[in-house]
Amino acid sequence: MMNGACSTLLIHRFNKNGIFCIIGSTFYIISPVVLQRLYGHEALSCHFVILLGLILWLYQDHKWKKKWQEIFMMPILWGLLGILAVSIHIYYLPMIYCFLLGCFITDVFKYKKYLRPFLCLISITALSLLMLWMLGAFYTKTNVAAQGLGIYSANINTFWNPLDSQGSNNGLLGDVSKGSRFLKPIAVNFGQYEGYAYVGLGIILGAIILLIASVCRSIKRQKRLTSDIREFLKNKKVWCIAGAVVFAVAMFYAISPSAYFNEKKIYDIYYSERIIKFMSSFRATGRYAWVGMYLIFTAVLYGLSRISRKKLMISLLAFCTVVQFADVSCLMSSRKWFKEEKTYTSPLASPAWEQLAEGCDKLIGLPYDQSQATIYTLSIFAYKHNMSINHFHVARPPFDDILNQYYKNMEQISNGNADPKALYVFLSEEFIPEVEGAKVYELDGYYVVKFPGQ
């Protein structure tokens, strides 16, 4: 719903025709990337956040009624967008900064406004940091950098590659070759499913139609195609430069630091340790290809909107939309599995779990295990029995704090001070401390221990 509303507003910026806006918004609603992320990484399917950044950039020439609004409304809106971005997923924030870069260029070189872009930068940075602080991002000393930089990048073929599900995209697309009904997947390097930014055959066809139309127009006017391109660039010079810069910056980061075309490595960039540490905070660099993808969407729709004959314009757009629907229909059908009601069956089948959990208000799993199967199994059991749990699955866990807590728990147990209301669950028998009088229960692959005093 939000993707549709925001895309309609975006298209309305350059075409006021309601039918064109509604049909054009379909491309953003059924974006292959959005469909890929649904039911797997839902926060990363909220692409209306990206579209809002693009909207603020394209609407920066909006005429405000009052002078203070002319100066401060855009900084306020950029700041609010920063709050929204970090509240949903931190990866959206650098994408928004890409559009803010475009805003800088057009504000300074086209609209001659030098203060406003800096106020926008200050506002979005300050309010984003404030929101992160309110969410507890600075509560622990966790290392936000993570391994995988260069693995989860985008392939240079990302815009026309529908991918497959045999290892290259970790099964996120469903059945084999279901990214597109018409195009075959192209091999990519392991982990580059994160850089999935297939635009769809409808958009590709739209771009081809625009190219053919431009050639025909040049022939009809007895002018070279290059002359028409120069004329267009002259009228939209600053916007074209800004768009090219935003696209180049986003794509350079998306394919970095190891660039691949298909399975062939093109180049490696060896950054300093400090830069690598910073980039590793956003290790899935391939996601920033989404900025380029939506710029392509918008550019193609803008080109189609320039067709002077209204009926032809709507007809061509509708045709491209039908092709897009047909192309990604396999991807949409692969998501039908999630429409069926699923019954959760806990692997903790032994009735002894219920008896041992009586009177406990917390579950302590030892040692820390990042396995999602273990974490979710124990967490669901704890939730259903109104117990807290000592750790859960998070993106950047504070390993030092977790390790210290582990040693503290083990020391308390060894000293005979086990928490009387805790259900101690060990993942392996070797980690159970030797305490006289302790009773060990092996249940469904786990070891539940009742220590003296419990």
Model-derived features: positions:
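Membrane-interfacial entry segments at the cytosolic side of transmembrane helices
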Residues: 69-73, 109-124, 228-241, 307-319
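Hydrophobic alpha-helical membrane-interfacial segments at the cytosolic entry of transmembrane helices
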Residues: 81, 104, 111-135, 146-151, ...
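Periplasmic/ER-lumenal interhelical loops and adjacent helix-loop junctions
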Residues: 127-214
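Extracytoplasmic
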Residues: 328-454
